[in-house]
Structures are given as structure tokens and as C-alpha cells.
Amino acid sequence: MALAYDGAIQRLIDAFANLPGIGPKGAQRIAFYLLNAPDEESQALIDAITEVKEKVRFCDICGNVCETSPCPVCADPRRDHSVICVVEEPKDVMSIERTREYRGMYHVLGGVINPMANVQPSDLNIAKLIERLKDSEVKEVILALNPNVEGEATTSFLSQLLSQTDIKVTRLASGLPVGGDLEYADEITLGRALAGRRAV
């Protein structure tokens, strides 16, 4: 049986281990780092987490994270409101913004279709997307989902759904590795994928 630490330190390790991308050893390193860190540093982390939980919300229009709704992208009159880029998560918005190649709007689904995890189309932010498309200003929807099985299934579902409209539906060009995540794509590759998007 593996040795566990007593009480509070083990609870902290377990809490960090529950975060994505952090395994048991990484969680232990972070916990002990905080144990030995100056009180101000630990308090700054506590304050940052508390502030995020209290202030950050999802944009009523696109579903991106923001402190005030609508988010800065939706509220910006200089953006191209005729194009909506559909992404899985808010972090994908930031990845695309870093390319400086895209000046349109976004729509965050909040996930992808995944029957294995019991995530159905009705669990995603699709109804709000359909509502937005009733605005005659929208001329193109870019499906910018991760090139993995779930992303492809969601892209296929959305392209069939949107084929009933007069809106041009495109997807990112190749260059992104199959099974990869937009979050990890470099700016040049992602920028080229946006520029070379193709009809679906």
C-alpha cells in the first residue's frame, strides 16, 4: 500500500492531482513548493483563484470567458461580424487570437460530441449558435475544432446541420496534426490553417 501524507497536505496533493495535466508527482511537488513558499505567494494564489471564481463568467453571446458580458471580442465594432469561428473551448479562442490572422467573431461550444463520455449535441452550446445564425449579417462559419475523433464527429454534425442554411461553412486547412489540439499548435501553423480553410 502506498504511503499517504497526513490530513491537509494529502488533501492539497489530491486537489492538485485532480487538475488536468498534473499527475501525482507533479501535485506533490506543487504542494510542497507552496508549503515552503512565502505567505504572500500562497495568499496571491488563493486570491487569484477566488477572484476568478467570483468575477469570470461566460459571454452571453459567444460563450467565451470574460468579466463583463458581452466579451471584448463581441463588443468590438471593428471585428468582422459576418464570420463566426466555432471552437471547442475558450482556450482555443486565445490560440487563434495569437495568430493575429483572424478578425471575426467566435462561438465556444463548451465541448465536443463524445458518446463515450455521454456528451450529446444537446449538451453543447449549439442552440445559441443557431440563434446567432439567424442574424442576416453572418455569411460564413468556420469550424475550428480539434482534429481528433470527437472534433471530427462534431464538425460532421455541425456541417450537416448548417447545410440547411445559406451560410458558407468552412473548416481549418490541413497542417494541424490529426489527434492534436489547437491549444498546442504554433501561431504560424494555426495562421496558415485559418488562411487556407476549405468548404465542408
Swiss-Prot record:
PROSITE patterns in the cross-refs: RECR, TOPRIM
One Pfam family it belongs to: Toprim_4
Keywords (A to Z) from UniProt: DNA damage, DNA recombination, DNA repair, Metal-binding, Zinc, Zinc-finger
Entry's Gene Ontology BP terms: DNA recombination; DNA repair
Boundaries of every Toprim domain copy: 82-177
Any GO MF annotation of the entry: DNA binding
Gene3D superfamilies the UniProt entry points to: 3.40.1360.10, 6.10.250.240, RecR Domain 1
CDD domains linked: TOPRIM_recR (cd01025)
Zinc finger motifs (C4-type), residue ranges: 59-74
Family: Belongs to the RecR family.
HAMAP family to which the protein is assigned, alphabetical: RecR (MF_00017)
Purpose: May play a role in DNA repair. It seems to be involved in an RecBC-independent recombinational process of DNA repair. It may act with RecF and RecO.
Identification of the protein by name: Recombination protein RecR
Organism: Bifidobacterium adolescentis (strain ATCC 15703 / DSM 20083 / NCTC 11814 / E194a)
